[in-house]
Amino acid sequence: MVSTTATAGTTASDDRKRQILALARQHDFLILEDDPYYYLHFGGLDEDAVTRKRGKSYWGLEEEHRERWGTGRVVRFESFSKILAAGLRLGFATGPTEILDAVDANTAMSNLQPSGVPGVMAYKLLNHWGIPGFLRHVDSVARYYAKRRDNFEAKARQVLGESGVAQWVTPVAGMFLWLKLNLPSSGPEEPEGDSFALISDKAKAAGVLAVPGVAFIPDGSKTCYVRTSFSIIEEKDVEEAFCRLRDVVLAAWKEAGKPMRPLA
């Protein structure tokens, strides 16, 4: 379970998380909360970083009801690679002692420990900042990505939205824009088209690359969705990238010999 997905950039509400926690209690299952984008939420960034309210994690929501329901159904995983430096490849976990002890034992048997240099770097930074400094830092990172999101989406709206080539939901956290491309049907089993064929063939040849949605679907079903990222692309290249993507979608309709249908 995640608050903000690395696939679609969608974010679960606190109420939705409470419903899932209730199901975990009812059906006796464990929630593995993989949440590397928790600190990259774009709401509330004009407020004080130390005192402002932040979204609740599954772990935090479970703690709220400790006396009534108890705890132990959530193991939470976070990452420094999204908020300090991608090259650190360092994260941390929070959860029941028995489970984390088993994780430690498995780590000791498999790779002994994470690399020492990234660990020391993260320790020194966190020790220097303290909690207030850390919260100010992550909010500055979130503001950086929020600005990139705004520019990226504005160009997408201008190029893809106005031409009827794609639609999406504005991400409120993370670094991805999940696009539903308006593609011609590739057969009765794929009425909305196949983004993998489009990206791997036409888009790649045009010099633009997005991750086909099939990469994130467990059963490998074909889909019209693609994942685009606004994390590192140069802002001057965004419009051109979307223009190339638009053109290959329009070319797919022309090749199919059909007029492009309006988006629902």
Q: Where are the regions that the model predicts?
A:
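PLP-dependent class I/II
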Residues: M1-A264
